[in-house]
Amino acid sequence: MGECHPWVQGSTLRDATWMQCMHFADNAGWPVTFHVTEPVGHDYPGRVSTPFDDFLWLAREIPTLKIILAHAGGLFPFYELNPKVRPDLQNVFYDLAACPLLYDPQVYRQLIDVVGYEKIIWGTDYPLRVMPKTQEKPDFASFKNLLHNEAKLSSKEASAIFGGNILSILP
């Protein structure tokens, strides 16, 4: 379910309507994807902050809910380096949609090193041209090749990130 963004609608994850949706998704075994913005960095029209505290709260409130944080989680994954927080994030995953527009390419290997390749899901935001300097038209191959080459993915990592991980969390 998603890409959800309650904050753009003036809401929060703690609102009863959103919690009802989260419990529904959890009971159905569906993962929920959230739009995530990094706390500092890019500014663009329509940007609305996505408070990291809300994601941590949700992961603790419904620990069985599979949560996918888009755009490498807005760098939320680095909270997993905190030993008091990491156990609460077992069901939090990170997609890579639009990452070439947001981060330097070394972010992919760093992300793998921090959270493990098992928690990373390849996403594209297609038909967005995520590599506008080299793409005339949107495509999947450019980003996939960038990720594979920059992160120096093993065949096991590539298989998981490019499909296995999402399949493992779908009902």
Feature annotation, model-predicted:
Residues M1, A25, H71, Y94, ...:
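Divalent metal-coordination and catalytic microenvironments
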Residues P6-V8, T37-G41, P127-R129:
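A short, flexible beta-alpha/helix-coil linker loop
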